[in-house]
Amino acid sequence: MLYLTEEHCIGGRRKMTDLQECRNEIDRIDSEIVRLFERRMKVSEDVAEYKIHTGKQVLDPVRERDKLKVLRAQAHSEFNARGVQELFQQVMAISRKRQYQLLTEEGVDEPRDYHMTDSLPLNDVTVVFQGVEGAYSYAAMRAYFPDEIRNYHVKTFRDAMEEVSAGRADYAVLPIENSTQGIVTDIYDLLTEYQLYIVGEQVVKADHVLLGIPGSSVAEIRTVYSHPQALAQCRKYLEAHPGWETVKAANTAASAKMVKEEGDPSRAAIASREAGEFYGLAVLGENLCHNGQNVTRFIIVSSRPVYEKNAEKVSVCFELPHESGTLYNMLSHMIYNGLNMTKIESRPIPGKTWQYRFFVDFLGNLEEPAVKNALRGLEAEADSMRVLGNYGRQEED
């Protein structure tokens, strides 16, 4: 028979205990814990009812901190004290989540600026994009909006946000992430700076080609222009031509425009096929990306806080107390409510050394109870939280 040298306290004495006997006792204790947990949750629901009728906040950090201090003091070792604290932090978090659910079930909604609409107004609107005609932002705009729109371009992402904020444009089209180069950090920072809202997204495949003036050839090329990300995405192709000088440009379409204006057969641009057609350039090389699934996701930004009734993706950002476990606690609101988180990013908070703002995307609609529960918890327990948008999701081709 298998024995363990576990300490089993009976009448103050220690003795060798059979493993199965230990397991049986643990099972009895666990069953008692479940019974007491459900009893505690019932009392927690009574607390929620009181808070519903009085308007008292669910989270009471002073009460929880004092309670944890008392519980820790009841443990008989430092190891157990830490365990008690972790255990009851989770118990309290679950209790709060149940209270958030009850608030939603009782129809106690958090005030939000957002308004639901059957569909976004896309006709007879003005759209701004960063870059020039032929850029991937231009392609994203043409894919998302009908032909009957007014559009114009600006030099920078900030300029595009400013145009929408000032009311000169109804929407802006902005790149937010690329499948090979990652996020566009400037866009994340601007989303927190401007009170604008994500109302849609568009995925565009970045099919880079080498463009030159008509009649030129690859053998004549000495200089290649493009955006730094495009140059990085075509690194292996460029390494196969060590004699070429690479020059950074504001964007891919701007590099194509530059080659067209210079009219020099020794100069080429890495840009889209559409940019080549727009500027009358010849395709000298194809399939330049070393990653065949090179796609860019663009967001559609508006000054109006609206979402379509069939919207299925939510974007939020939040800041946290600089304390252990706070990020886990925030993400647990999505996990507990069965929400599928599709993305998480972080950006440094200006003026707060080593502190970060988090950006999270998850699937859902602002009308869904699970989403309301999660947002209620995030808003109550983060230092600050903002819903950036609720919009339709586009899958990659």
Go through each PLM region and give its residues.
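Domain-level signature for soluble enzymes in the chorismate/prephenate branch of the shikimate pathway
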Residues: L2-L4, I10-D397
